[in-house]
UniProtKB/Swiss-Prot annotation:
InterPro entries: CoA-bd, NAD(P)-bd_dom_sf, Rex_DNA-bd_C_dom, Tscrpt_rep_Rex, WH-like_DNA-bd_sf, WH_DNA-bd_sf. Modulates transcription in response to changes in cellular NADH/NAD(+) redox state. It comes from Bacillus thuringiensis subsp. konkukian (strain 97-27). NCBIfam families: PRK05472.1-3, PRK05472.1-5, PRK05472.2-3, PRK05472.2-4, PRK05472.2-5. The lineage of its organism: Bacteria, Bacillati, Bacillota, Bacilli, Bacillales. The gene is rex. Its main location: cytoplasm. This is Redox-sensing transcriptional repressor Rex. Residues 16-55 bind DNA. Homodimer.
Length: 209
């Protein structure tokens, strides 16, 4: 896939398409229309057709899309056969929930280890994942760990991000309110649950359905 030719908005929707197509395949469905996809993933059909057009002819007019072909295509496009090993830093309530969940519906993403400073948690396993002391971060992060989930207090988020920048980590999923400064070779996605909730409430009040 030639990433530079695909808008980031399209790239963000690809996992959404893939998950739905997986479910279709498991149900035995052989083909699907853009209208059916639109209804399921809540993306208008014109956008879906435009997204798919970046990859060439994925379907046929009047027929729709072959489910097995789409499944195979997106599996390869999203590198689903490659395991992405993840480290989690911050084993509070949210971090603990992640460890128990550990992407059970996504077989190619696994949290391999976690880090915290709590004496009660360091040296234990949560959801089968070992918890190490934060002091061991650089030592424990092997070259296989390229993604980190950050669920630490906002006050220490930047310092942890600075330490991650000295490892082989190239992607950070930041669940803290802090807006982090990282080097250009690290991609960071910010997910502020409080902001998301405020946005939802605003839309409920100002854009009633």
């Amino acid at each position: 896939m030639e990433q530079q030719k695909i808008p980031q908005a399209t790239a963000k929707r690809l996992p959404l398409y893939y998950r739905f197509i997986q479910n279709l395949s498991l149900s035995g469905k052989q083909r699907v229309s853009s209208a059916e996809l639109s209804e399921a993933v809540k993306v208008d059909s014109a956008t879906i057709r435009r997204d798919f057009s970046y990859f060439g002819a994925l379907g046929k007019k009047g027929y729709g899309y072959n489910v097995n072909y789409l499944l195979s295509f997106f599996r390869e496009t999203l590198d689903q056969d490659d395991i992405t090993r993840v480290a989690l830093i911050g084993v509070g309530n949210l971090g603990t929930a992640f460890l128990h969940y550990n992407f059970t519906k996504n077989n190619n993403t696994k949290i391999e280890m976690a880090f915290d400073v709590s004496e009660e948690k360091v040296g234990t396993e949560i959801g089968g994942i070992p918890v190490y002391h934060l002091d061991e971060l650089e030592e424990r992060l092997s070259t296989d760990i390229q993604v980190a989930i950050l669920t630490v207090p906002a006050t220490v988020a930047q310092s942890v991000a600075d330490r991650l920048a000295e490892t082989n980590v190239h992607g950070i999923l930041n669940f803290t309110p802090a807006r982090l400064n990282v080097s250009e070779n690290i991609r960071i996605h910010h997910i502020d649950l409080a902001v998301e909730l405020q946005t939802l409430v605003y839309f409920l009040k100002n854009y009633p359905q």
